[in-house]
Amino acid sequence: MASPEGTDGEGMGCCGWFQVEAIVERKTGDTISDDESEEENETDTDVDGFIDNTLINNTQEDRETAQQLLQVQTAHADAQTLQKLKRKYIGSPLSDISNQQTVYREEVKRRLILSEDSGYGNTLETLETSQQVEYEKGNGCGSSQNGGSQNSNCSEHSVSNMDIDTNMETPTHQLQELFKSSNVQGRLHFKFKEVYGVPYTELVRTFKSDSTCCNDWICAIFGVNETLAEALKTILKPQCVYYHMQCLTCSWGVIVMMLIRYICGKNRKTITKSLSSILNVPQEQMLIQPPKLRSPAVALYFYKTAMSNISEVYGETPEWIQRQTQLQHSLQDNQFELSKMVQWAFDNEVTDDSQIAFLYAQLADIDSNAQAFLKSNMQAKYVKDCGIMCRHYKRAQQQQMNMCQWIKHICSKVDEGGDWKPIVQFLRYQGVDFISFLSYFKLFLQGTPKHNCLVLCGPPNTGKSCFAMSLINFFQGSVISFVNSQSHFWLQPLDNAKLGLLDDATDTCWRYIDDYLRNLLDGNPISLDRKHKQLVQIKCPPVIITTNVNPMQDAKLRYLHSRISVFKFENPFPLDNNGNPVYELSNVNWKCFFERTWSRLNLDNDEDKENNGDSIPTFRCVPEQNTRLL
């Protein structure tokens, strides 16, 4: 074998090393190169070359270099650990470079579909997204030149895209996108059906006006905070007598659906403002309509869901749910009886057909017969028949009463607490002798011949019509107008009255009375023409006539002078500073007036003295039911 390079002889071990050092360093007889400094070997510091002083000077620098290296290594290790965590919890990076182009195309397609072309801003965002994807594909994610760093960049890009997609699916973002929709109500109805499984329109009836009041409402509120939804159950208790609340969660957040009955009727505006302030939800995220009260399906839905654990129920169940879900209420549903409707109209003195229909329909919640009336297809016929029968009964009852019984009957319907003095003071203010007026008024109420007509005469604005109208209103009398004198039936209202009034008679009217109505002023029986009915013979009731013309001063009306009694009202009607009458001529005061002057007007009836009970018999048109057990 060849000897090792740089050795002569067979030096081995340490001896060989020193021999090599001696040979390499310098040989005997070699010339010293000019490049070498002779002074360097001749100095006294040749011994210093054996000690390396640079190690002592550079110790601090070596330590700092080691710390920097350690920091770099630690940061690299942390980056690798973080990358592993991202791959584990977020998703693996794009490891296959050949599939990167396909993956990015799918991502771009997904992001383009998610974006809505609803404005200039959204279009720019879509273009910027596509340009950014193409730029990243050209910078390394689509090539294989960057190795591991390329995988790291692609992983970070996929993580950022995933964060964007996650943010777009939040409930707040979806509700914001809802407001951009052209049909917000449609999307709310669709979401309600998707969550609750029943269409909202099947539970409610539509109120077009926001000002219509109702006690029962069905409210659906979308995107409610969960804490506020729980607090709503406590806040609503002082405002309502019943609520049925359900809270379900979806991608939009919490959807609250409740059937609520308020203490008093409220409209949609009031409810919307109240719930919006409590739940911090805009009005566009609410559906508020009244329920279908006559739908068995709606009643059954709330009845069954109230027994489940998803509902929170407070208060007593509404009667419209009980009536349609409980057997007891189902057995109580009867057929319609016209006699009960007539009895109700007679007791409440409702004789007008429109009032009968409207007021009786409002009793459907508490009256089974009214409910059966609403279910009937012959409501118009029932209303007409009820009005006719009620008017027949009222007329027959009135004809059976004399004037004393009638005054007692109408006084029983007026409240207590009146004062008779304002009426007397007003008569004295007009210069009317109260004793003379009371004497004639007694004969006037009895219908004495030649004393059947009382005339109030005087200048305008003296209170003639006010005094007469207040008395007619108390007596529930009838008013006739001379403007209808061309008709044969203008006196027909006197057929059903205990007292009549002809207001503001002129010269022409007095000529007509002098020509055709002398018997009417006498208080004798007259023949009265009625529309669509045969002629009827009646005794004309007492009549009050107000006029600005004094018939006693007209010689052409001399045949009427013995048939009428004139009281002059010459002073202006007194008013206070607020424009109210100084002397109040109300029903309560007239009641007190008749009670005070009852004996002076000779209204005591012999039949009443014999019968200590009620002189007016109680009318009853409903057959009595036998409640005895068989």
Swiss-Prot record:
Origin species: Human papillomavirus 66
Motif extent (Nuclear localization signal): 86-88
Subunit structure: Can form hexamers. Interacts with E2 protein; this interaction increases E1 DNA binding specificity. Interacts with host DNA polymerase subunit POLA2. Interacts with host single stranded DNA-binding protein RPA1. Interacts with host TOP1; this interaction stimulates the enzymatic activity of TOP1.
Region (Disordered): 26-46, 136-166
Cross-link (Glycyl lysine isopeptide (Lys-Gly) (interchain with G-Cter in SUMO)): K539
Compositional bias annotation for Polar residues: 156-166
Annotated EC: 5.6.2.4
Family: Belongs to the papillomaviridae E1 protein family.
Domain of life: Viruses
Stated name of the protein: Replication protein E1
Record's compositionally biased regions (Low complexity): 142-155
Record key words, sorted: ATP-binding, DNA replication, DNA-binding, Early protein, Helicase, Host nucleus, Hydrolase, Isomerase, Isopeptide bond, Nucleotide-binding, Phosphoprotein, Ubl conjugation
Phosphoserine modification, residue list: S92
Cellular component GO terms held in the UniProt record: host cell nucleus
